[in-house]
């Protein structure tokens, strides 16, 4: 079996993680005590991907829950699925990282790291054939960003050939929780570029927009936002958990989605997004799903894909649908919007189809796009970073934990390089490259 170990770190990571386990448990018909109450053998066939079978037929999530303060852990534990997790897998400090990346990465977080890695090892050892790791965290705070990236580098060190997927909540342009967000995010992206295989960039503002404009929720809560994220997370791994006509796994995704190793930052989307009240009145067609999935309003990162070009994309459909129709629709969308796809990467959309739809829907689709417009997101953070760093504002909090200013400069230039790499491939065309070849031949 292809198992996945989920590590959730920091307040945001744990809240998303908790929501995700609710969604997954519901799909596999597992109740809050870890017992199975379903009627379909499909639910149990590959349940090992996310669950360990314990004595007495209980199913225990392969989750590692980490935080530097006990608060969030307590609320997860007292939440609806709090009793499912293995008690030893809760690892928390007492003092918090106080929104300080350096505390999470170098001091407080580093002290806790050994015990976190012990639990990760234990989980990895109980797998037959470990496919990889998923990490949920935010990049704006201290624990998820600082300690999350430290954990990432440690996992990369011990399991160099396993896929690491991160679901990273980026700071949003209008909604900011903390002043030092740009610092924390830039330092984290610096690490993600080097150590992650796939990073799903999600930001709260895009989620708020989806909730208020598309789902018509008057006052969206974090619970609603996290529900959207967990729908995407469940969609990405659905092919591993249920049988399908065309399968995808984390590695296949990475191979098809990442044309150059540094450019692994994706925008996720999900369809159908309909308000909770109007769900039962609509029967979706594959055409509508495809249309909605590629719509800019459905993107969970606050960037407009129409400002860039798709280097690659993946679409994971769920539900019973004719393959032929899926292929036709995917071809149509690329044909009609060909200017938005990089012409020097032919057939750059990967499709997967899984037969089992999520609860309450006949069919759904998860979209993952590697679009050059994601640079807008990094540009925004970078501008805020530069504005503060030029005045050396708040730096003493970081240098006080033993950090060096050089690290900030390195992180800044790495992120700017990333932006210019995206820009370079956005402008590239197929013709240009042929010309270059001719030019080289003439010189020779």
UniProtKB/Swiss-Prot annotation:
Cofactor list: Mg(2+)
5-glutamyl polyglutamate PTM sites in chain numbering: 436
Effect on the protein upon substituting residue 262 to Q: In OZEMA2; loss of function in oocyte maturation; decreased alpha/beta-tubulin heterodimer assembly
PTM (free text): Some glutamate residues at the C-terminus are polyglutamylated, resulting in polyglutamate chains on the gamma-carboxyl group. Polyglutamylation plays a key role in microtubule severing by spastin (SPAST). SPAST preferentially recognizes and acts on microtubules decorated with short polyglutamate tails: severing activity by SPAST increases as the number of glutamates per tubulin rises from one to eight, but decreases beyond this glutamylation threshold. Glutamylation is also involved in cilia motility. Some glutamate residues at the C-terminus are monoglycylated but not polyglycylated due to the absence of functional TTLL10 in human. Monoglycylation is mainly limited to tubulin incorporated into cilia and flagella axonemes, which is required for their stability and maintenance. Flagella glycylation controls sperm motility. Both polyglutamylation and monoglycylation can coexist on the same protein on adjacent residues, and lowering glycylation levels increases polyglutamylation, and reciprocally.
Alphabetical list of Pfam families matching this protein: Tubulin, Tubulin_C
Motif (MREI motif): 1-4
CDD domains: beta_tubulin
Residues involved in GTP binding: 11, 69, 138, 142-144, 204, 226
Primary subcellular site in the record, as a coarse category: cytoplasm
Residue numbers carrying Phosphoserine: 172
Entries under SMART domains matching the protein: Tubulin, Tubulin_C
Effect caused by changing residue 348 to S: In OZEMA2; loss of function in meiotic spindle assembly
InterPro entries linked to this entry: Beta-tubulin_BS, Beta_tubulin, Tub_FtsZ_C, Tubulin, Tubulin/FtsZ-like_C, Tubulin/FtsZ_2-layer-sand-dom, Tubulin/FtsZ_GTPase_sf, Tubulin_C
Start and end residues of each stretch annotated as Disordered: 423-444
GO biological process: microtubule cytoskeleton organization; mitotic cell cycle; oocyte maturation; spindle assembly involved in female meiosis
Gene3D superfamilies to which the protein is assigned, alphabetical: Helix hairpin bin (1.10.287.600), Tubulin/FtsZ, C-terminal domain (3.30.1330.20), Tubulin/FtsZ, GTPase domain (3.40.50.1440)
Residues reported to bind Mg(2+): 69
Biased composition (Acidic residues): 429-444
Keyword list, A-Z: Cytoplasm, Cytoskeleton, Disease variant, GTP-binding, Isopeptide bond, Magnesium, Metal-binding, Microtubule, Nucleotide-binding, Phosphoprotein
Record family assignment: Belongs to the tubulin family.
Subunit structure of this chain's protein: Dimer of alpha and beta chains. A typical microtubule is a hollow water-filled tube with an outer diameter of 25 nm and an inner diameter of 15 nM. Alpha-beta heterodimers associate head-to-tail to form protofilaments running lengthwise along the microtubule wall with the beta-tubulin subunit facing the microtubule plus end conferring a structural polarity. Microtubules usually have 13 protofilaments but different protofilament numbers can be found in some organisms and specialized cells.
Biological role stated in the UniProt entry: Tubulin is the major constituent of microtubules, a cylinder consisting of laterally associated linear protofilaments composed of alpha- and beta-tubulin heterodimers. Microtubules grow by the addition of GTP-tubulin dimers to the microtubule end, where a stabilizing cap forms. Below the cap, tubulin dimers are in GDP-bound state, owing to GTPase activity of alpha-tubulin. TUBB8 has a key role in meiotic spindle assembly and oocyte maturation.
Disease as annotated in the protein's UniProt record: Oocyte/zygote/embryo maturation arrest 2: A primary infertility disorder caused by defective oocyte maturation. Oocytes are arrested at metaphase I, and have an abnormal or no detectable spindle on polarization microscopy. OOMD2 inheritance can be autosomal dominant or autosomal recessive.
Entry protein name: Tubulin beta-8 chain
UniProt organism field: Homo sapiens (Human)
